[in-house]
Regions:
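Phosphate-binding site recognition
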Residues: 1-417, 434-437
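Acidic, low-complexity intrinsically disordered tails
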Residues: 379, 462, 504, 511-515, ...
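Conserved catalytic cores of phosphodiester-cleaving nucleases, focusing on short active-site segments
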Residues: 427, 451-455, 464-473, 487
Length: 528
């Protein structure tokens, strides 16, 4: 048993022994299925807080010949798999967190040298009787062990892409690193599985990728590994039952990463913190400050500002992911920034529609923090004033509401403002603070038509009135309230009982004036 060659299972044991551990050992069934095949190269990229290192430690505990992990895995899903015992602790396993190596190195070249020396030292301790052709060359040493001992290798590289975050501009050193990994891993009989984790997909340079033998599983397309990206809906429901938390609130705050086959993924670190502390809140910024997001927002490529504001308002925006360079420094268009934000977890990607959105309220709060501290001062003012606008609706002060919407329109005047959708967008920003008290639905189906915006009080704020908003464009503002009643919008609130505020808003293009009317009604034994 060494430090990097055939380590013990202690790191995975820590995860299993924690207050909350969600069984993700089903991943091993997939890795077992590709052992010693052309599909043995796996690169998994996902954001921080999404359990990459835990998965790497799990693979280490399962494959490492330095472990006796049968009992450790016996109560988990993988133990039911027919191949469970066949591969359990049967491989020479090299497991390295590249960030740890980088932190003790002063350059990428030193990282490569240190990695080689550390692995070679463990190899020579484990196999002192091997006739090493060149005991300074890690590739030669691994080949010698394989040929003389008939022991194949599983190589697990956690945070493999750290150098692209630390050395963003050093292209020559990046290529050297990629070439080194290729030389160690590609077309080598001694490799039966290579598993790498990172935040970014594999870096491309020139006309090819040095690591083009890898299958990539990312936040854009996790493929068959989607359920292992984070916590699934079923897993979170079980935790909510165990810890007596409201699944609706948890879903609103931490869900939002959706993949094929309708797999919905929650942010695991945030869910765990929420359960442990029994409190809905923003746990994202405890591991990732909004400064990281602010850097990219302040780039403000043409169209980026519009996209960010639209997403804060709850919309989706189209994105072309095809030109992204898979690094954190090469940006030519807004799409490059948005694609990076997909990989960082700041937006979720819909593979079918090719659009992105802010996944949940926790992440949305980070956008508001970033915008408030950015150079977009005029926009942040509208967001900060949104609490006053909401209060004005509660107090039925339509003139103040109309003035606030006018101000929000002025501050986002670069947005094409020519239909009800644009008006809805502006009002969503003007009422951003409502997200603290309401579940917001846009174009909620109901009655004979649909309402533009419906605000349903969250369970913990039952004293707040529901709000139904009808948006008009060059129409009679009083007719908006009548239309709400005529179309029976409030039938959409069938399970709601209590006060409801009917809000009509109209924008007159000729006078450029916003008008607002507010009426109160009650949903009880009779429906509005």
């Amino acid at each position: 048993m060494g430090i990097y060659l055939n380590p013990d299972s202690s790191k995975f044991e820590e995860a299993v022994n924690s207050d909350i551990y969600v069984d993700k050992t089903g991943l091993l069934a997939y890795t077992n299925s590709v052992l010693h095949t052309m599909q043995k190269y796996i690169c998994v990229s996902r954001p921080r807080r999404f359990g990459k290192s835990t998965a790497a430690n799990m693979l280490t505990a399962y494959y490492s010949r330095g472990c006796a992990a049968g009992q450790l895995f016996s109560r988990f899903e993988i133990a039911k798999n027919s191949a469970f015992k066949q591969y359990l602790n049967q491989y020479n396993t090299i497991s390295v967190n590249m960030q740890e190596i980088l932190s003790r190195s002063h350059s990428i070249y030193e990282l490569i040298e240190r990695f080689s020396k550390l692995v070679i030292r463990d190899l020579k301790k484990e196999y002192p009787d091997v006739d090493y052709f060149d005991d300074t060359d890690v590739i030669e040493c691994m080949q010698d062990v394989y040929s003389q001992k008939k022991q194949a290798f599983v190589v697990i590289l956690d945070e493999w892409d750290c150098i692209f975050r630390e050395y963003k501009e050093d292209k020559a050193a990046q290529e050297k690193y990629l070439d080194f990994l290729r030389d160690v891993l590609k077309d080598k009989a001694y490799i039966h599985l290579a598993y790498m984790t990172g935040i970014l997909p594999i870096k491309k340079y020139g006309t090819h990728s040095a690591l083009n033998m890898f299958d990539e599983f990312s936040m854009i397309d996790p493929g068959p590994l989607a359920e292992y990206v984070g916590f699934t809906e079923a897993e979170v429901r079980m935790l909510c039952e165990q810890y007596q938390m409201d699944i609706t609130e948890v879903k609103c705050w931490y869900d939002g990463y959706s993949f094929e086959n309708e797999i919905s993924i929650y942010s695991p670190r945030s869910v765990v913190s929420c359960m442990r502390f029994k409190k809905i809140g923003n746990y994202w910024n405890q591991t990732e400050t909004f400064e990281a997001l602010r850097i990219y927002i302040d780039m403000n490529f043409e169209g980026l500002k519009d996209d960010v504001l639209s997403m804060i308002a709850g919309n989706t925006v189209p994105v072309n992911i095809g030109n992204f360079s898979n690094d954190m420094s090469t940006f030519h268009f807004e799409d490059d920034v948005l694609t990076l934000l997909i990989h960082l977890g700041y937006v979720s990607y819909d593979y079918d529609s090719k659009t992105v959105k802010i996944p949940n309220e926790e992440v949305r709060a980070e956008y508001v923090n970033s915008v408030s501290a950015s150079e977009w001062g005029e926009v942040s003012k509208s967001l900060k004033n949104s609490a006053d606008t909401l209060e004005a609706i509660w107090q039925k002060r339509p003139k103040q509401v109309a003035e606030a919407i006018s101000q929000a329109h002025f501050e986002t005047s670069h947005i094409q403002y020519n239909d009800e959708n644009a008006l809805s967008y502006t009002i969503s920003l003007a009422l951003y603070a409502a997200r603290n008290f309401y579940v917001i639905h846009r174009e909620l189906a109901g009655g004979k038509g649909f309402a533009d915006l419906v605000f349903i009080p969250r369970k913990k704020f039952p004293e707040k009135p529901a709000i139904v908003v009808e948006l008009k464009w060059d129409k009679d503002v009083d007719g908006a309230i009548a239309q709400i009643k005529n179309k029976e919008y409030c039938r959409s609130l069938e399970e709601y009982r209590g006060n409801v505020l009917l809000v009509g808003v109209n924008y007159n293009r000729k006078t450029k004036v916003h008008e607002c009317v507010i009426e109160e009604d009650v949903i009880g034994t009779e429906i509005v």
